[in-house]
């Protein structure tokens, strides 16, 4: 695991400095992925890593775990509660357009992640940093991220690392057990977990990605196909014929 940790932290340093960046900013959710990414960023940029804790109608325990992650790895951090901004935007959207119902949970949840993205980039722009994403290979494969939300980042160090390997890497890096052992959650609403929403475990998903076909293989294949657009850049219309 040390070889992987060194490879990823060195890659971060090369990618960011090679593109003119001064450091890294990462959103700290209190989960395993963001904690691992913060630890890798701290290795790459010991003096120029910033973690942002961005609660938005969130479980207070997640913010506490995010702050634990920051203190454990000595990552400078700020906490910005986006709840008021989110509610104001939600009211404006729903009151201005009746076609967007206020009880559309998916749309509402995606608005949260896009507010977080906007906040991360505000800090990155000001500091000359790059936004480092926390998505892993398992999530990317089935599109378990918000387009231009948590998917709106500059770099994805875990983009080729499955959730199973992220857990191993977390233990190697010394991520607190409380964070390693908690059920994975995007924090979109109270009690939400990744595996409940997906309908299968990360272990089965990672086995599928390794070529095994379990009882949820068809459902996984369907998600992979349906989310292809999320993994591709916006298509460009061809120039008109001369």
Where are the model-predicted features located?
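Conserved G/P- and acidic residue-centered "switch" motifs that form tight phosphate/ATP-binding loops
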Residues: 31
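ATP/NTP-dependent adenylation/nucleotidyl-transfer catalytic domains that generate, transfer
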Residues: 1-24, 39-43, 47-50, 57-58, ...
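Catalytic nucleophile loop
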Residues: 34
